[in-house]
Curated annotation (Swiss-Prot):
Record-linked Pfam families: Arginosuc_syn_C, Arginosuc_synth
Annotated InterPro entries: Arginosuc_syn_C, Arginosuc_syn_N, Arginosuc_synth, Arginosuc_synth_CS, Arginosuc_synth_type_1_subfam, AS_cat/multimer_dom_body, Rossmann-like_a/b/a_fold
Coiled-coil region(s): none
UniProt main location, coarse: cytoplasm
Top-level taxonomy: Bacteria, Bacillati, Cyanobacteriota, Cyanophyceae, Synechococcales
Involved pathway(s): Amino-acid biosynthesis; L-arginine biosynthesis; L-arginine from L-ornithine and carbamoyl phosphate: step 2/3
Native species: Synechococcus elongatus (strain ATCC 33912 / PCC 7942 / FACHB-805)
Keyword flag Nucleotide-binding: yes
Binding site for L-aspartate: 121, 125-126
Protein's gene: argG
Protein name per UniProt: Argininosuccinate synthase
Length: 400
């Protein structure tokens, strides 16, 4: 008897998930494999996937357009949280995993599957994100992970697939592993496994090399409503369209490349390349607007919440009680994060050059050093005396 009768497989069309189809049937005795590919903004890349899955042995191939849901329910909360794992990575790939897990669980219920499966290896973070998210949504649903058990190298995996007529989507001489959605691309493996190796220009697709970017800067204005991006250069746009347009504008100016050594949840370090033009610019603009409208204590406390939120999402705990509690705090802080941020895009850099909001806490007549100054300078002496009292008492008590 096989490990399951009917399985819904998270499918990308890549090497591992394609090989999973014959492997589940030939090695694990699965009778029927239904593939599910989530369209999260890949666009034309998903065109041949449906037929490829069927050619590889799937009984049914599902392609679900979840791009709007992805942006609305996953990317936008990440912007409100200013999510940057280890201060750099905006979670472009990690954010997709809980949504794909949700789609898998829903498809399993709809098609009467007794298990779901994914093609994650035992060294990555995605296996945790999928397994934990699926368990949170349906603790009784079995999860199969062939690539975690089959013990094949990437070259052996490609060879196994070729035995069943599955063409390799990459050259064996340069086997990059690439994941893409509307928010950006992640690239790893191959020559990138050497942390000293400079990525070749062939690695990038969304961003221009600095040498090829325009010699004149571009200025853009981003409008936010309660922490959510709503306008680009004064034009109201749907969430997906806004990110698409901003990806093109920022990528044209070489903005959005990340090359980092990342600490994975499983305890190893990994060299990762990311391209996330729009997401990085939106987080930068959102952070700046918050500095204008939030009180100092809320802003400072939120930094710790943001770090915890980013770690939870990176580590696969999107559906955890702690993240839900942090979500509530973040949403409370966003009620007055409404306004406009102006940025200068030039030669790989996005620089905030202006911001405005009707909710602004910036008081010109309190901040100015000119004749309009209304700050009570005489009050400073008493404030300093009280503020410094603990330090003064400590010094008086312990001085030699």
């Amino acid at each position: 008897m096989g490990r399951a009768k009917r399985v819904v497989l998270a499918y990308s069309g890549g090497v591992d998930t394609s090989v999973c189809i014959p492997y589940l049937k030939q090695e694990w005795g699965v009778e029927e494999v239904i593939t599910l590919a989530a369209d999260l903004g890949q666009g034309d890349e998903l065109g041949p996937i449906r037929q490829k899955a069927l050619d590889s042995g799937a009984v049914e191939s599902l392609v679900i357009d979840a791009t709007a849901e992805f942006v609305r329910d996953y990317a936008f909360p990440a912007i409100q949280a200013n999510s940057l794992y280890e201060g750099r990575y905006p979670l472009s790939t990690a954010l997709a995993r809980p949504l794909i897990a949700k789609l898998l669980v829903e498809a399993a219920a709809k098609y009467g599957a007794d298990a779901v499966a994914h093609g994650c290896t035992g060294k990555g973070n995605d296996q945790v994100r999928f397994d934990v998210s699926i368990a949170a949504l349906n603790p009784d649903l079995k999860v199969l992970a062939p690539a975690r058990e089959w013990g094949m190298s990437r070259e052996e995996t490609i060879a196994y697939g070729e035995r069943f007529g599955i063409p390799a989507p990459v050259k064996k001489s340069s086997p990059y592993s690439i994941d893409r959605n509307l928010l950006g691309r992640s690239i790893e493996a191959g020559p990138l496994e050497d942390p000293l190796h400079e990525p070749l220009e062939e690695v990038y697709a969304l961003t221009k090399a600095i040498a090829n970017t325009p010699d004149e800067p571009a200025y853009i204005e981003l409008g936010f409503d309660q922490g959510l991006p709503v306008t680009l250069n004064g034009q109201a746009l749907a969430p997906v369209a806004l990110i698409q347009q901003l990806n093109a504008i920022a990528g044209e100016h070489g903005i959005g490349r990340i090359d980092m050594i990342e600490n994975r949840l499983v305890g190893i370090k990994s060299r990762e390349i990311y391209e996330t033009p729009a997401l990085l610019v939106l987080i930068q603009a959102h952070q700046d607007l918050e500095s204008l409208v939030l009180t100092a204590d809320v802003s400072q406390y939120k930094r710790g919440i943001e770090n915890s939120w980013s770690n939870l999402v990176y580590n696969g705990l999107w559906y955890s009680p702690l993240k839900a509690a942090l979500d509530a705090f973040i949403q409370q802080t966003q009620q007055r994060v409404t306004g406009t941020v102006r940025l200068r895009l030039f030669k790989g850099n996005a620089t905030v050059v202006g911001r405005s909001s009707e909710q602004s806490l910036y008081s010109p007549d309190m901040a100015t050093y000119g004749a309009e100054d209304r700050f009570d300078h005489k009050a400073a002496e008493g404030f300093i005396y009280v503020w410094g009292m603990p330090t003064r008492i400590w010094s008086q008590t312990h001085r030699a």
